[in-house]
Structure formats: C-alpha cells, structure tokens
Amino acid sequence: MELAYLHTRPEQYARLKAECADFIVKENLGYEMSGDGEFVAVKVRKTDCNTLFVGEKLAQFVGISERNMGYAGLKDRKAVTEQWFCLHMPGQPTPDFRSFQLEGVDILEVTRHHRKIRTGSLEGNHFEILLRGAKETDELNVRLNNIKQCGFPNYFTEQRFGRDGHNLTQALRWAQGEINVKDRKKRSFYLSAARSEVFNLVVSERIALQLAQQVLRGDMLQLQGSHSWFQADEKEDLNALQARLEQQDILLTAPLIGEQNPPATDIENQLVEQHQALLTLMAKERMKAARRPMLMQAQALQWAFVAEGLKLAFYLPAGSYATALVREVVNVQED
C-alpha cells in the first residue's frame, strides 16, 4: 500500500544518492565534549562506510573490545557523514590517530569525554542533499514553500524496515507464531519495524482523509519542544486546540504501539485494532506504548537550483528521516 502524500504526489523525478557527496549528514549531539574523562571521543567523516564497521575498526586500533565503543546513531552508508564515536579507555593516554588508516574515513577531532555516547543521545542532524535532475518550475517552488510552511509526513522510511522490508516481514511472521526470534538485535529491529508500520498507516489515513492538520476528539497532542502529551478529551475546547496547532504550540501525534495503548481517535483505534497479532506481540515483549508527531517541520529549510539539480539544506530532530521530506519534493528514480 502506498502511503499518502501531504502535498500530493510530486510531478518531477530526480536521483537521490547518485554519488556519496550528494547526501551529507552532520550529527548534532546537542552538547560539547568535556575534554577530560574515561572516554576518548573521536569525530570522524566517513564516505561510503557503515557506522558499525568504522566503530569496530576504531576499537581494534586502540586495542579495546567493541563493547567498549559507542556512538549516538547509525548514519547512512551511501553518504558523507560526520559523527562522534567514544572509546572507553580509563587510565590510559589518548592514542595518536595519525596512523589510523581506513578507506573513506578521516579523523576530524580527538578529545576526551566524561561519559559514554549512548545510542539515541543526539539532538538531530544537519542535511545537505542534491537531487540530481530536478528542474526549477513554478510547481516545485510552490511545493517547497508549502513544505517549509506546513511540514511533511513524519513517516518512517525504507531503512527502518530493512532491505526489501525484511524486518517487517519477519516481525509479522514472529507475531503469527511462524518463527521464534532469539537474537536480541533482531528482536529490536523487528519490533521497531512493526511499530513503524502501524504508525505510518495511521498517519497516511489521516492525510488521505485530509485530517492531518485538524484536531479531532480523542487526539493525543504533544507540546512543542517536549515529549509531554495530553488528550483532546471532552474537557478540552477543540477550537482553542486547533488555534494552538496552527500556531505550532502543539503537535498531532500517532501511536508507537506497545502494551496498554491508550484509546485515541476513532480512526486510530480502528486501524490499531486491525493488528491484533502485533498488539499481542508488543504486550508479550513489554514494549512501552509511545507517541510520535504525525508531521515534522524541517528547520532552516533552504534550497537552490544548480546545474546538476536541486540542492536542499535543512535540520531535523533525531528520529526523523530526510528521505521522508525528499519523498514530498520529488519522485526518486532508482539507479
């Protein structure tokens, strides 16, 4: 099933990641390294490299176990990305990385930090993207301005579901009792894929019904800039909430299913209830129900048309996908 577009299906086609340099990601942890402590912090720029592979090579270089290496998040492989790694080396001098050699990897900075960089401990990412072959038209400029003003669907995209949707397929088989999954990492990937699928379906349905920017009775609303949310129950004034939504003081959310999912809108409740096997699996695995904004606003969105195509620059908070924004701009041509 194709997910709905907030700004209608794009007219143009373009190539994404034709070259690594067409997709640049710069991590923002949201804090500075302390300069001292038990951890060696290494900032790298990697090109066409897997995050985990680079982390393993750094750990090998300094002679520690991969378990004592950390990073905030996995970055795209076919891209140029900058991110921090940390290496637990208490009581040891800071290594000299000038002799570290790995194709596609440059060491940008080495310092110390007082605690481990943990998965998920980042504020967001800066993106610079070239969409090759996109042409300047009135329609595309209007589309970009609409995305800047109204945002884009906060969908989970392909990387969340694995190659050819493998993680989702396995999650569904697991939920139906066809397979048993013992590997901890695989369990995590499959559960995340299942939750992401239900989230996407709820958001897509709201967009298809032209209700993705309207507060409904039962909606779960998130306060801007926080993870706190409240329900648009009978005590709440829907008109007042709609005004707050339009001022971007609050955000509409969709479910990340878990155990004890709170009732929401009729639309959401009906869609969630269609996935009983997944709900049972989530309860069995003690996954905590959560919420995620339906729409996302790209911060500092800028664009320029160049000879090769369309250049985009923007910032997204952690957990949102640049490819979800790109999907609203152009149809991506497969190489």
From Swiss-Prot:
It comes from Pasteurella multocida (strain Pm70). GO terms for biological process: tRNA pseudouridine synthesis. Responsible for synthesis of pseudouridine from uracil-13 in transfer RNAs. It is an enzyme of class 5 (isomerase). The active site is at D76 (nucleophile). Keywords: Isomerase, tRNA processing. The gene is truD. This is tRNA pseudouridine synthase D. Pfam families: TruD. One of its GO terms (molecular function) is tRNA pseudouridine(13) synthase activity. Coiled coil: none annotated. Residues 151-307 form the TRUD domain. HAMAP family: TruD. InterPro entries: PsdUridine_synth_cat_dom_sf, PsdUridine_synth_TruD, PsdUridine_synth_TruD_CS, PsdUridine_synth_TruD_insert, TruD_catalytic, TruD_insert_sf, TruD_pseudoU_synthase. PROSITE patterns: TRUD (PS50984), UPF0024 (PS01268). GO terms for cellular component: cytosol. Belongs to the pseudouridine synthase TruD family. It catalyses: uridine(13) in tRNA = pseudouridine(13) in tRNA. Its EC number is 5.4.99.27. The keyword Isomerase applies. The lineage of its organism: Bacteria, Pseudomonadati, Pseudomonadota, Gammaproteobacteria, Pasteurellales.
